[in-house]
Amino acid sequence: MTKYKTIVADPPWKYGKWGKASDSPLARKKFPNGQWEKDFEIPYNTMSVKEIKALNVAGLADENCELYLWTTQKYLPDAFEVLKAWGFKYCQTLTWCKTPRGTGQGGVYCPTTEFLILGRKGKAPKTTRINTTWWNVKRTANHSKKPEFFQDLIETVSDAPRLEMFARRERENWDVWGNEVESSVAL
């Protein structure tokens, strides 16, 4: 079985309704009880944090491995727990500032960022130094799809062999796993 030096995971976090009523014109639907809903039907199956933590990612990782874990504002604290459960130590947080800015989902402040948490086990690879941790990158047309920019960036700084978990398409020189692609790995 291949042990991976780089793993990218974009878990299908489970979302629900978002908070209290607002006079904001951004609120899509206000219910008689004062609650408002900014929820929408997510076009894929989701998983609870417990289910995500239970995945055997540690068994796929090389003794020297970097994990890039996508998360949103809502799941940021849980993402750190997932990192630990999978056997990785936190290193850095990379930020995708979505452009153009939209309304985001929920909260007083509409989050228009997503985070790519870098975790590591073992030794860091000798790599190119990148002089920033945030990027303004155009939004993709599909919900939750990440810009190719980040995969290209990861290929620049992190070693092969590489695995993308919860992948949506095949990518040259990567193994993939997920229910939207023909998986090249069993979990």
Please provide the spans of the model-predicted regions.
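Class I S-adenosyl-L-methionine-dependent methyltransferase catalytic core
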Residues: 1-187
